[in-house]
């Protein structure tokens, strides 16, 4: 029952804050889909709390940098198509290897940052704030849901004791 309570509370806060994120993204001229990738990175990161927020942020940003390396590197010799493929393979390898460092240990976050950059056509000045604000929304979604679940459980325990 406790697991369902937590899931329901996270679903409620995620639903509310997702709607708010959509409005904020449009109001600020950000990429709403990239923000949802930021949210997803936090939810998917095995570490929670501020540590998970920081690790997710570092990996998302490293992914942005790696994508730019691929894009700029491939553009150096656009007539040599194979260069882009080789560069992508080498960079993907490095994206995984960097996970030996704690702050870069969430490999999916690195790939999410890279994918957002590719989808955003390399416009990192738009992609980075979209990912970052989305990441903060993801943190708020999950942690406000956990707070709501704890508060609800505490209220139920007080009610059960008083009966």
Give residue ranges: language-model regions.
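Hydrophobic faces of alpha-helical transmembrane segments in multi-pass integral membrane proteins
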Residues: 9-21, 54, 58-70, 87-95, ...
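Interhelical loops and loop-helix junctions of multi-pass membrane transporters/channels
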Residues: 3, 7, 11, 79-82, ...
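Pore- and pathway-forming membrane helices of multi-pass small-molecule/ion transporters and channels
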Residues: 30-47, 89-123
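Membrane-interfacial segments
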Residues: 28-29, 74-82, 102-107, 144-156
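Structural signature of hydrophobic alpha-helical transmembrane segments
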Residues: 22-36, 71-89
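Amphipathic alpha-helical interaction elements
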Residues: 45-46, 62, 78
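Alpha-helical transmembrane segments and their membrane-interface boundaries
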Residues: 1-48, 123, 127-128, 137-149, ...
């Amino acid at each position: 029952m406790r697991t369902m309570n937590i899931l329901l509370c996270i679903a409620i806060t995620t639903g509310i804050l997702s709607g708010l994120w959509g409005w904020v993204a449009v109001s600020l001229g950000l990429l709403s889909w990239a923000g949802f990738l930021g949210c997803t990175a936090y939810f998917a990161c095995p570490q929670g709390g501020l540590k998970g927020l920081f690790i997710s942020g570092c990996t998302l940003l490293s992914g942005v940098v790696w994508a730019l390396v691929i894009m700029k590197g491939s553009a150096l010799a656009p007539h040599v198509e194979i260069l882009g493929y080789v560069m992508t393979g080498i960079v993907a390898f490095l994206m995984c290897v960097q996970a030996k460092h704690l702050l870069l240990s969430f490999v999916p976050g690195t790939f999410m940052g890279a994918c957002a950059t590719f989808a955003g056509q390399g416009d990192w000045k738009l992609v980075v704030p979209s990912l970052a604000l989305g990441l903060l929304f993801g943190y708020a979604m999950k942690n406000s849901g956990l707070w709501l679940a704890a508060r609800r459980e505490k209220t139920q325990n007080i009610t059960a004791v008083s009966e």
